[in-house]
Amino acid sequence: MTAALFVVSEEGYWAEECIKPLTTLESAGVDVTIATPSGSPPVVDERSLDPEAAGGEAAAAEFREIDAEHPKLNDPEPIATVEATAYDAVVFPGGHGTVWDVNQDRHARQLLLETVAGDDGVALVVCHAVGILAFTREADGTPLVADRAVTGFPNAWEEGIVDEHDRMDDGRKLPYWVEDEVVLAGADWDAELDADTSVTVDGDLITARGPESSTAAAATLLDAL
């Protein structure tokens, strides 16, 4: 059976970016495992459950129900205990929370590196989780993302979320902006700001811009599998 690992934030994952790929893969018969940095259940960003952000009342209710009741989401594995070679795909959903935990986690970075470096695996990285690409390096120190085509959460959108001191509404200071770090690491960045969705495929690395691209990203991943 085809197997996929989801690496989800405990600091605030974006519901659509996790749940759309999760339900799409499960509906296609893919065996899904959930992992978080510590092994505690992931924490959804409440902003992503607002009907306006979720795409309507029905979608918001569905996301809230799945977050609360999905057995695997509520009983994850610690990242340090899973092996990339056990999975055909590794998925990194976004959400601002990833900038504080998943993107900075050495075991998460190793999972990504091993997935993309191998011959069989494929990685899907969404929205703010794309920041992990800036901090994942090959054995010789070369950034994994160097010269790769990617999309992700753009500065143009971040400007509308943080204040002049990079603080979010909840008071947390954003430690870095995804686009800045990924470009600095040598990526060929294009968030396709004029397009309704943005999904970029570069070999065994799939990246998606944000929530509105989650469905297309899931379909692209299924095609790759």
Please state what every model-predicted region is.
Residues 125-130:
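Short, thiol/selenol-centered motifs that function as redox-active sites or metal-ligating centers
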Residues 1-120, 132-225:
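Extended, subdomain-level signal for the structured scaffold at the beginning of enzyme domains
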